[in-house]
Amino acid sequence: MNNTALVMNKISQLPVQQRQEIIGLLEELEEAKAKESSRTDFITFVKRMWPSFIAGRHHSIMSDAFERVANGELKRLIINMPPRHTKSEFASYLFPAWFLGRYPEKKIIQTAHTAELAVGFGRKVRNLINQEDFQEVFPGISLSADSKAAGRWNTNKKGDYFAIGVGGAVTGKGADVLIIDDPHSEQEAALGAYNPDVYDKVYEWYTSGPRQRLQPGGAIIIVMTRWSTRDLTGQIIKSATQREGADEWEVIELPAILPSEEPLWPEFWPLDQLQALKAELPVSKWSAQYQQDPTAEEGALIKREWWQEWEYDSPPPCEAIIQSWDTAFLKTQRADYSACTCLLYTSDAADEERG
């Protein structure tokens, strides 16, 4: 018999009143431990605030990253993940509330591709902080008396929350945490299919606006679905690899279907439903939005199954050899190296063309 069983056996032998008092004290102790866990462990907080929450493997990954941001261990985080996988619920609703519960004096700037959406997040966070179950976890934390606007409010400890859409002005605002949630709209992505330059305006706004509003030691969280190699994730990663001293990012990619052919979130998205969705979408959209790979080989002009192998010393007979060079011009540690592609126009290919 283990210690718990021994204790419960002893309690069961006590008079009814004493037994009820002890059980009541034990329940209070368990509740106190649960509240403390909710303050320090993000996923525990999520389950307490959202009892019907269906946990998946990716939620543990996201929670670990958010905890490291809150603890000051991670300053630049990008999470790329598919639609309808609780991206916004975690990053733009539950995390800001939990963070301000822990650090009610901090400042958050929340962005989304429209001001309406960003303000909607602010309203949900504000309402959650006002709820009794939140107050039980973070007693003494509330909104200031004059905090009525959904997208602009303060805590009673002089913390600040400010919500804006992409392109909005952030002059005069500072952020200990900047959260960017899906900065690109579907309409923008549709235009981007024909004119990739449309993605540049988001990157230019990010660098000229929100990025400059970060407090010393502040953190940036970007959660988004991929659309293009020119989207915000793509341009930030490119900058990080090409510019000396640029921000260094931790990038978490969460594809809807894993390399093992298992769904990322089988508890909510069964494989057959994802495969049906894949069959209905253009390859480029599925690869980018659901697999977080806007350069997936399925959408490439040259496909993997076309490649053939031969022994190094015995290449096939060829009619011509073509070389294409991509040279590196930057002399920095992060500069891309020079690369060469050598193409052989083989005799059998020439024979097929001739006849």
Which residue stretches match the model-derived regions?
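Conserved nucleotide-state-sensing and coupling region of NTP-binding domains
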Residues: 111-170
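Conserved small/polar residues in nucleotide/adenosyl-binding loops
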Residues: 345-353
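Conserved P-loop
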Residues: 80-82, 87-133
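ATPase catalytic-site recognition across NTP-hydrolyzing enzymes
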Residues: 261-327
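An active-site-proximal beta-strand-loop segment
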Residues: 325-338
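N-terminal accessory segments
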Residues: 1-75
